[in-house]
Amino acid sequence: MPEEPLAERRRSQADKLIELVTAERAVLFRDQFNEPHAHILVDDHWEIWRVRSKQFRRWLCSLLWESEQKAPHSNALTSALTIIESRACFKGEQITLENRVCWYEGALWYDLSNRNWEVVRITEGGWEIVTDPPILFRRYAHQSAQVVPDTSGDIEALNEFLNLAKEEQKLLLLVYL
């Protein structure tokens, strides 16, 4: 393995970790409660992680390992997280994170909470699955992935299982659903 330049060897692991976060195009920001987050490209989609989460910490460790085949020292990791957190809070934009569902620009947006971070956009004209929505959603560990909607379904098929006397009642129930 070639010898590292002296200046490169003197840079702390914390500094290297901070630079790697920037190089990976992570967007640091704070939410409406002033909590630091990162918007990170994972495979082919974007995810939002709290900076102090285990997931972000593990990702940070993997960045250094992939870059230098070294594990970060505990103090370096703590220092880097503190600086990243500070940059998110004081230099990052404030972005409102929504929880599961929100109304935005004439559409209802519903987070499917699935592995691909897909969202359903619902308008008067129908619905579509969006992979890069204009709004961001907060995720919690207890949230389960939702069923992905299917265009081949027929909501009228529910009528055969309903015991409703009047046609208007069926319509009212279907509108409610």
Language-model regions: role of each:
Residues 29, 33, 56, 90, ...:
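Phenylalanine-focused residue identity feature
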Residues 31-33, 97, 171-175:
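Short coil/turn segments at secondary-structure boundaries
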Residues 2-76:
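N-terminal accessory targeting/assembly segments
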Residues 3-8, 77-95, 146-156:
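Generic detector of solvent-exposed, compositionally biased contiguous segments
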